[in-house]
Amino acid sequence: MNRLHVLATGPLVTVQDRGRPGLAHLGVARAGALDAPAAALANRLVGNAPDAAVLEVVLGGLEVRAEAGCWVAVTGAGRAYAGAEWLPAGASLRIGIPATGVCGYLAIAGGIAVPPVLGSRSTDTLAWIGPARVEPGAVLPVGKPNGRPRALDTPRPPRPGPLRVHVGPRADWFADDALERLCATPYVVAADSNRIGLRLDGPALVRRREGELPSEGMVLGAVQVPPSGVPIVFLADHPPTGGYPVLAVVDEADLWQCAQLRPGEEVRFTRSPRGAR
């Protein structure tokens, strides 16, 4: 079995796959790659199954060395195109700081073969379910390759425009024009955003009802509004329950964009056409 030696890391490197959907009733978040299409592309390039585990690399800084020769692919932040590359035995690969975006993905033929927890190899950074964050000195097992690499593949082109949202279950807790104000107002990504949620800076949304809800189930992409009135978009490691009202839900097809937004960048929302999901 091949192994990957971690020589250096940046701000955050974790193992991710498609996550743990369907376990919210047990109090387990979905987790998984923040930019799911980029992770799937990396796997496709090296011949892996779509649910193989990859390394999610926040703002670069990762350097690894493979014990045996292997096919690798890097996608996501700062990558206009991608292709599989052969990494010789003993050679190292370094992912630098991207010029744009946040989350990059490193796939290796055979996938990262850490033991699965609750059906997934993903790290949940809120509950710390799954493997520990990847640190220098870590040695990661690699599975047996079972597919053909692809020399070149074209990532999806960035979809220009705002994040599409659906009306949330607690829209009636807000002023009649709250959703329109959300969609008409530019927000800015806050510095404390992470895998749990995209935190925003901008004007507060006005509520018509006082008090708080009993905790209820939350979904990926929920636009939750805390007492400050400034919305938060729940991402992969969001808590399964929450007590603040949800005004809207971001269309899942657009959530990958949240993985590539840097602090200080502008975010806009728009009402999703009916049936966009």
Label every model-predicted segment.
Residues 1-277:
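Conserved "landmark" site that anchors the functional core of diverse proteins
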